[in-house]
Regions:
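Helix-to-loop junction immediately C-terminal to a conserved catalytic motif
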Residues: 49
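Conserved ABC ATPase "signature" region
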Residues: 96, 107-122
């Protein structure tokens, strides 16, 4: 699915958190959002997901305006920073509860995504998860429905080198399947290694757009 921001601004109270953003994200590529904490990366993801709507301008998903033509994208997986799950449930049960909302995801698919993120053999309750395990479960939740749009906000936080490689492999696989992937990451080199294009964000404004050199 393609995504377009047309003259998009967002105010929270008296603060302008996104200011006149105009970008187009093509279908089936990996796009990075680069910037310091509070720059507007997460806010842009929330706008794409339909969790909030633009104060001015339009966020357009495949030609349809969010908040006007559609309430939210029809096929989207989202992992915002610090994902929250039920503390008394294990990973499988948390994902099964989410899957039950649509009732279209089989137990075998849940087992598969837990295997993909390295949590298949772990039966701990979520409250006993390490930060890295919580990140892994958040990624699993974002990809288990095989969505057309995948938003990953700082997916490599709290992950060791092997976990970061796992994220790279997942992103590459989702791109190969045709998904539009948008992610943020504090590590510029890691972000560039995963992305086809990167938008730099400062104080809610796009200040640069470039294609990473991967040679």
């Amino acid at each position: 699915m393609s995504i377009e921001f047309k003259n998009v601004s967002k105010k929270l109270g008296n603060n302008i958190v996104i200011n006149n953003v105009n970008i187009e994200i093509k279908k089936g590529i990996v796009t990075g959002l680069k910037g310091i904490n509070g720059s507007g990366k997460t806010m842009m993801m929330r706008l794409i997901a339909g969790l909030i709507y633009a104060t001015k301008g339009e966020v357009i998903i495949d030609g349809k305006v969010l908040g006007k033509d559609i309430s939210f994208p029809p096929s989207i997986g989202l992992m915002l920073e610090n994902p929250a799950f039920l503390p008394s449930y294990n990973g499988f049960d948390n994902l099964k509860m989410l899957a039950s909302i649509k009732g279209e995801i089989k137990d075998e698919k849940i087992d598969e995504v837990l295997e993909t993120v390295g949590l298949a053999a772990i039966d701990k309750k979520y409250r006993k998860y390490s930060l890295g395990m919580k990140q892994r479960l958040g990624i699993a939740a974002a990809i288990m429905e095989e969505p057309d749009i995948i938003l990953l906000d700082e997916p490599t936080n709290s992950l060791d080198a092997s976990g970061q490689e796992m994220v790279k492999e997942i992103v590459a696989k989702e791109k190969e399947s045709g998904a539009t992937v948008i992610l943020s990451c504090h590590d510029s080199a890691l972000l560039e290694s995963m992305c086809d294009e990167i938008f730099n964000i400062e104080v809610g404004e796009i200040t640069n757009h470039y294609v990473p050199d991967k040679e």
